[in-house]
Amino acid sequence: MTSYPRPDFERNPLRWETLNGQWDFLFDDADTGLAENWQRTSLPEKVSVTTSNTREGASAESDSVVQKIVGDTQALIQNNVFSASSQTTNSKTKIKVPFVFQSPASGINDRGVHEVLWYERAISDLRTAQEKEQGHRLVLRFGAVDYEATIWLNGEYIGGHRGGHVPFEIDATDAVNAAGQSSAHRLTIRVYDSAYDLTQPRGKQYWGAKPESIFYTPSGGIWQSVWLEVVPSARIADSSSGTVIKSNDIHGGQLRSTIVTKGRRVGKSYNVELEASFAGVPVAKSDKKALPRETDTVAVDLNVRLSEEQRSKLPQSILQDAPLDNDTCWRDGVALWSPEHPQLYDLVIRLYDSSDKVIDEVKTTTGMRSIDWTKGDGLWRLNDKPYFQALCLDQGYWPDTFMTPPTPESLKTDIELAKKMGLNGCRKHQKVEDPLFYYWADKLGYLVWGEMANAYQFSQEYVERFNAEWTEAVKLVINHPSVVTWTPVNESWGYGSLKDNVDQRNHIRQLYYLTKSLDNTRSINDNCGWEHVITDLTTFHDYSDGPELEKTCASLDLITGQKAGRDMFVPAIPGVEEGAKHKPGAPVMNTEFGGVNIAPAKKEDGEENRDWGYTTATNPDDLVKRIDRLVRGTIEGGHCCAFVYTQLADIEQEVNGLYTFDREEKLDSTKVKALITDAIQTFYNRVNKA
């Protein structure tokens, strides 16, 4: 992983160094590292394990959580609990970052319970003498560390972060400067990641000894890229710090941005400039706008409509793929973004000092596209036109690396594999993916529903944790045109008492309005699948086989009826609140269905029950026929304007993917693409007749 991790927000000039690779690593199962000041003395070669943090047995509460999710018809593995470790010492070893210790790719491949982890390595100051003189900063950047990270440099605390699925950065400059002329600096990281805390957002990471049903091997510690970067002291901030580029005004052609800066010194004056080009043709450049005295934020608007002269300069390759008279590609000189024509504007943001010198420059992209779900006719629109979202459930796991993509290209490959099957997007399920995924979704034309890793028990601690991390997740990907819907919660996970618990309902309402306050341009799916509290979309999950699903999807009453024993909308609580109902005309979407595996061969070890799916096909041809009937049943019922097929690829024991775990075809992709394309056409035929 030697390519720059954030091509969606790249400085010019770019000065960085990857910290991926070999680190010293030590399990601290007795949690003695802080008391013994490992951050000051360096990691010991060995440490005694005087007490075990592995809890034998399982709580009835955690078992009931799992059983409620998977349903009473699915038997759980008996005694699926971690055994207490007999190990009396842990030795310092090497780990290959960014792969987690549970994975083979890390070089450790340990599936036991280790809740406290220590990482250490030497780093050097990348800054040149001139950069130091100019006051440039040395920043440590972490893609994601699950779950709580504390960071020291040369034994001095420099920062920390809580939240396992979102990036953070630490300014290491002062600690490096304090070390004087030293050329090597000791970077130490302590990570705490509970194996059992069900109020901690964890997504599909299981708390049992063996992954089962829809749950998988956990990923503890550093699981995305780590790198050093040299940045100007005063600089342009990314979306995580508040820079937002709104690109939904396809009629006015206005790009509306809020540019945030960091590192502004008191009394200093700065100006911000935004420039746009398309396919190498300069389109527009804003006036230089002064940062107000009272804030580090400035609004910059830009008209990105191409004039006739600018359009005449476009390369023929662009015009052949996206003719100017095609209103799905262009709107009165505005280049439109869609899965079929993912046209992107190149943007450059510049920061000037008071002497009109460029002190920072960042390159990024955007796509002009609008989303509408409010017409009241049951349709979801992209760029003013009804659009059918044919999505897959994409959970982002790989055989030897788990939640970490094995290579940067793996993220691009998954998008290409989905499109090969005739799909135009995904629900990125129970995971905030590496930002490189969204970069490729923008470039390749792939719709994405933004989601977060849920927890499984409700508490005030959970509310505080989730609000903070969900906010960071939304801000991380808010500038990507490929992201079209927000889904904070899935299937009431963590909200087991919505039927009569006002506190749980109020938190889902809070998440809805919190998300709206961050971004009112995208649809919000409050609680995907059932028990909606307040939502823009009526989404339901139904893993019935073909005939039963056809019956359900032909009736709005059956669609909005109970699913998996849950009400589709929360009922009234007498004397307390009215509950919720389907809003007539709101888009209806089947956001989980399918999940069909192929009947496994008998195994001598008796583990055939580990090959798991919701329903079972006899062979690949039977699987294609089942998918055809499920897809047609969803669409031809006349109510659904989107589906999410479960799932893109097999994961461990859940072998109901369109591809195997290592991304090999399980069935003929040309047949699947043809049947999906044909079924979607029936949707457009019906809409066009209306």
Predicted regions and their residues:
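Substrate-binding/catalytic cleft of secreted carbohydrate-active enzymes
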Residues: G425-E664, K671-I676, Y684-N688
